[in-house]
Curated annotation (Swiss-Prot):
Residue ranges occupied by any Glutamine amidotransferase type-1 domain in the UniProt entry: 2-232
Pathway assignment: Purine metabolism; IMP biosynthesis via de novo pathway; 5-amino-1-(5-phospho-D-ribosyl)imidazole from N(2)-formyl-N(1)-(5-phospho-D-ribosyl)glycinamide: step 1/2
HAMAP family per record: PurQ (MF_00421)
ATP-binding listed as a keyword: yes
One MF term in the entry's GO annotations: phosphoribosylformylglycinamidine synthase activity
TM regions (residue ranges): none
E.C. numbers: 6.3.5.3, 3.5.1.2
Any Pfam family: GATase_5
Keyword check for Ligase: yes
Name by which UniProt lists this protein: Phosphoribosylformylglycinamidine synthase subunit PurQ
GO biological process: 'de novo' IMP biosynthetic process
């Protein structure tokens, strides 16, 4: 299986995503934002960072990159797509997932191990989890507060489109503690925390007393590998 990671000007976590894919047993494929070729990949990752310096709005300029027309088309045909942090912002700007992301309510950049609850384990990216499972994934952003209209929020909650929720203290003012969502079809998932930074043991707090931030993120990538192979 081949999973593409798209690099944009200002991407920071593309190499981490490529490594996570390799550790999950798939072939990572580096893709460039200026191309119109997905190179026959089976799934896509839009990584974190500060694409185009976060000018205008986070993810706004990147969502208009040449390769995004191929991403939108592939997502429409059912290809699994994962947007992480800045990638989530791109997905929202491209209207591939509902809602939007704005400045954290406290106005500060945050970087810590974040406790999450899995709300939907039926997407290609979350099939390795169980609904209600508690996990810890690193979180780092300045504009990660999830917003949506009251009507849209009701639909998200009612149709199971919330995929992850912050557990404990809400770190950025996201409505309903929402950390990640999916599209209606379920193949496109966006979240602010960084699963690609939690794929190997020994990184982050990993004692029984502390929040665990070691390998919880690996399940995102092994899940999509299994899902794609089953469908094949």
């Amino acid at each position: 299986m081949r999973i593409g990671v798209i690099t944009f000007p200002g991407s920071l976590d593309d190499r981490d995503a490529l490594r996570a894919i390799r550790l999950a047993g798939a072939e990572p494929v580096a893709l460039w934002h200026g191309d119109h070729d997905l190179q026959g990949v089976d799934a896509l990752v839009l990584p974190g960072g500060f694409s185009y310096g976060d000018y205008l709005r986070c993810g706004a300029i990147a969502s208009l990159s040449p390769i995004m027309s191929e991403v939108v088309e592939a997502a429409g045909k059912g290809m699994p797509v994962l947007g992480i942090c800045n990638g989530f912002q791109m997905l929202a700007e491209a209207i591939l997932v509902p809602g939007g992301l704005i400045r954290n309510d406290h106005g500060n950049f945050i970087c810590h191990a974040q406790r999450l609850t899995v709300e939907n384990a039926e997407t290609p990216w979350t099939g390795g989890f169980e609904r209600g499972q508690k996990i810890v994934i690193p979180l780092k952003n300045g504009e990660g507060s999830f917003i949506a209209s009251a009507e849209e929020l009701k639909r998200l909650e009612g149709e199971g489109m919330v995929v992850f929720r912050y557990r404990g203290v809400n770190p950025n003012g996201s409505l309903n503690d929402i950390a990640g969502v999916r599209n209606e079809r379920g193949n496109v998932v966006g979240l602010m925390p960084h699963p690609e930074h939690a794929v190997e043991p020994g990184f982050g707090p990993d004692t029984d007393q502390a929040m665990r931030s070691g390998t919880d993120g690996l399940a995102f990538f092994t899940s999509v590998v299994r899902s794609t192979l089953v469908e094949a």
